[in-house]
């Protein structure tokens, strides 16, 4: 009886050549290709056909975009999770959902192996394998990029040509692109040279901010307990909401970043990330929290958010700490309900209004006018006590 290998399949260069490679290097195996649709723009029927044409014995193409949004993206929005203060974790958030689907199919098919096309230098190999280990440690992983003779994307293209596999990558334009509903990342090629300004042709969604619409646009986002529900007054499904914000953000050049990041595996890498809708959501959520969370909760949440983002980036979605932080984040969102109005213009997002019944901001107290709850004279006593440690230190130092 043939062994079964479940392959994380995208239809791209790497995973397309893995199918014939597996059949050449492992005897009596069936390759079962699994593509989890997390909102990438590829035509799923084409991906299905390509998997079979490349030699897969069976292919699954499942739409998991709703789960992607509700189970990972919206949790990240509540936490305002970022990696190294900039990256909105587009690839990192998708991997645990895809890996979970791989494990489910492996169980269904009775497969002992899962194979992925992640390179030996990247973070994704860790993300996939950490999820697989957490969900079923008995499953064995095959990682071709760590063992085969193919050493570069140029080599991979040559292999594809020899096996009559059609791919979109060329040696002239060697970008590596990862796309889903939340973002598009572009790496490789001339981007790898730090002295190069990235070219406009790297953009897959957004217009360059310089070329964006000359007319500003206002957008309203309604949140209920930290979860986005409406855009411009229209209630939308989670997936449709992200699509709508992407559409609005793209034409204004929102959410384009060019960063050098520290990979989990120890090296630095440079990438161009486009997260138009996500950037609008993060900014709107941040604005709403600034008005509805007390200082101590907000400041502590910001500290914890950094760790939360790091855990996601490192592939530890299914660790106990991430789940525990989620419980805290959920508590912080009780009063994060209301509408935020923002202004989009040439890559920028500006606050344009906060509408909530839960604001801790009180105009009467915050203004320079009189207030029954606050007497200006009270500040003197507060300052005396607040600065007491500084005074004592200065007195001791003066001896």
UniProtKB/Swiss-Prot annotation:
EC number(s) for this protein? 6.3.4.5
Q: Which GO terms describe its molecular function?
A: argininosuccinate synthase activity; ATP binding
This protein's pathway: Amino-acid biosynthesis; L-arginine biosynthesis; L-arginine from L-ornithine and carbamoyl phosphate: step 2/3
Annotated residues that bind L-aspartate are located at 119, 123-124
Catalytic activity reported: L-citrulline + L-aspartate + ATP = 2-(N(omega)-L-arginino)succinate + AMP + diphosphate + H(+)
GO cellular component terms attached to this protein's record: cytoplasm
Keyword presence, Cytoplasm: yes
SUPFAM superfamilies assigned to the protein according to its UniProt record, in alphabetical order: Adenine nucleotide alpha hydrolases-like, Argininosuccinate synthetase, C-terminal domain
Q: Where does it primarily localize? A: cytoplasm
Q: InterPro entries given for it?
A: Arginosuc_syn_C, Arginosuc_syn_N, Arginosuc_synth, Arginosuc_synth_CS, Arginosuc_synth_type_1_subfam, AS_cat/multimer_dom_body, Rossmann-like_a/b/a_fold
State whether it acts alone or in a complex, and with which partners, per the record.
Homotetramer.
Q: Which NCBIfam families match?
A: argG (TIGR00032), PRK00509.1 (NF001770)
User: What name is this protein filed under?
Assistant: Argininosuccinate synthase
């Amino acid at each position: 009886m043939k062994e079964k290998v479940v392959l994380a399949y995208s239809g791209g260069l790497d995973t397309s050549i893995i199918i014939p490679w597996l059949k050449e290097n492992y005897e009596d195996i069936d390759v079962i290709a699994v593509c989890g649709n997390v909102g990438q723009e590829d035509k799923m029927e084409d991906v299905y056909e390509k998997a079979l044409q490349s030699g897969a014995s069976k292919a699954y193409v499942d739409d998991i975009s709703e789960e992607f949004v509700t189970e990972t993206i919206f949790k990240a929005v509540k936490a305002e999770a970022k990696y190294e203060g900039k990256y909105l974790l587009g690839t990192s958030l998708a991997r645990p959902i895809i890996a979970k689907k791989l494990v489910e199919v492996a169980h269904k098919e009775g497969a002992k192996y899962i194979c992925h096309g992640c390179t030996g230098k990247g973070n994704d190999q860790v993300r996939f394998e950490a999820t697989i280990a957490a969900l079923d440690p008995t499953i064995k992983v095959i990682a071709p990029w760590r063992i085969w003779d193919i050493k570069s994307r140029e080599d991979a293209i040559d292999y594809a040509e020899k096996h009559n596999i059609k791919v979109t990558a060329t040696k002239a334009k060697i970008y590596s692109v990862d796309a889903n509903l939340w973002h598009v990342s572009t790496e490789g090629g001339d981007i790898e040279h730090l002295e190069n300004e990235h070219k406009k042709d790297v953009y897959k969604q957004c217009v360059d901010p310089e070329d964006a619409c000359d007319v500003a646009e206002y957008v309203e986002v309604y949140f209920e307990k930290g979860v986005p529900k409406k855009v411009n007054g229209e209630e939308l499904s989670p997936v449709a909401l992200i699509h709508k914000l992407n559409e609005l953000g793209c034409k204004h050049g929102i959410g384009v970043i060019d960063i050098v990041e520290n990979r989990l595996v120890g090296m630095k890498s440079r990438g161009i990330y486009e997260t138009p809708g996500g950037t609008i959501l993060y900014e709107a959520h941040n604005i709403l929290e600034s008005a509805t969370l007390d200082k101590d909760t907000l400041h502590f949440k910001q500290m914890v958010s950094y760790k939360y983002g790091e855990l996601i980036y490192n592939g530890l979605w299914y660790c106990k700490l991430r789940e525990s932080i989620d419980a805290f984040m959920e508590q912080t969102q009780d009063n994060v309900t209301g509408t935020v109005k923002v202004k989009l213009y040439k890559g920028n997002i500006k606050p344009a209004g906060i509408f909530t019944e839960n604001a801790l901001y009180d105009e009467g107290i915050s203004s320079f006018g009189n207030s029954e709850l606050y007497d200006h004279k009270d500040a003197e006593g507060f300052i005396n006590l607040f600065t007491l440690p500084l005074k004592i230190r200065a007195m001791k130092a003066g001896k």
